[in-house]
Amino acid sequence: RVVESSEEPETVNMRRAEWRTNKCKFTIMVSVATDREDKDPVNAAKKLLDEAEAKGVDELRREKDEWYRNFWSNSFVKLGDDYLENIYYLHRYLMSAGSRGEFPLAFNGGLWRWNRDVLNWGTPHHWNQQQEYWGLCAQNDWRLMKPYLDTYFKMIPFAEKLAKEYGAEHDALLITEAHNFNGVQWGKDKRYLRNNFTPASQIASLFWDYYEFTGDEEFLKERAY
């Protein structure tokens, strides 16, 4: 949407739209919605734009700047080497940009990748996605862990069922190497994945990290344990 414009974009085809104006400077707002969030994603996307336009660009920028000001104040490193320090801050930025919604960081590269927007797959998620979350709690970015941890909480019904298939009848979870966003154990029937269960203990350590750095006993008692 072009802010404060009386002209309407013209749809050329399903992949292209055009908007013509004599203005030299203008503001474009973009929203994204899918039928997972709303059965009518077009109207849902328009509603997001209406809310954003009503709030105004200046207020949106102020909110964004305030969020990042608080975020950057959470931690810092001083290593005496600009290159290494910048890697630390770059990773923090990548995680803040991609791990604040309902889902964890996009698998196999995250939100921003070196090869533009080329992504070989977005799901299933494999266990080695955990490496993106190593150290988040230690650097005081534990809030960014929530989408990752919630993904595994969604797996509980599927993991319980799989454990029973392997003979564990009560209070057992069996998590495979790969899974879908909704918790389905995608790797359980894959010949090259079905017997790889060691990732479960490594993933569990991230739940302990979250408790250890936050001291959230309710999380430990009611959810993780």
Segments predicted by a language model, with ranges:
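Acidic/polar, glycine-enriched structural segments that form the non-catalytic walls/loops
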Residues: 1-122, 142-145, 152-161
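Helix-terminus loop motifs that line ligand-binding clefts
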Residues: 95, 99-127, 134-205, 211-214, ...
